[in-house]
């Protein structure tokens, strides 16, 4: 099948391996994958991060005569003139219509979802709103951070993409189901203020926020006047009861704990905002001790 591809080169290379012809490719990342992809596509039809609203780009896609447009981790919306050239499909790393938007990993963890997954859907004029072609659920391990979740969804996402493209090539495109707008939720990117830890939350809520933002950009707090990004915390009931929310202490076992709205959390790993240096459990305990003495 003749495919115009937008996104990370790995998926395009796998589709080419499956026997499809990549007649136009717009990659969002350079590197070895991009160089390999360029060797598979006709000269002049592989580009790196093009402006997809540019009339020249639209004309190049049209001239390639694709039968299908594929988006896999392309980070901008494809304009209607491109989507009018051929049917378009994409794969989103959530169970749409839940967590539409650029940061579904964060929101799946932060919301405490027990199950997430990937969704193949038609491309339309809005982000992640097209009719659903297929889904693959995945249990969400509560210990995963955003990086672990992203890695866990990579293979199911690629497998689902290849399966759906093969169905199109065989003339058996999956039936589509419109998304239920009543069940839709947004997954926007968060600003720096949104990533500040609220110690009025429960310990479990704080742990989810830390995991959802790790390893980058990370949820942050202030310890003794110093901004610290927390990468791993653990809820605990072993803390001095005299502490108020946001107050910290170091237990006899050497682990720093901070009182939350309900329970407390142990500070296990972090990163200094000053120089991005990693902070161990011991480093965090030393910061808490220093802040209590000051």
Task: Indicate residue ranges for each PLM-predicted region.
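Short, solvent-exposed secondary-structure boundary/capping segments
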Residues: 238-245
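One-carbon transfer enzymes
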Residues: 1-217, 221, 226, 235, ...
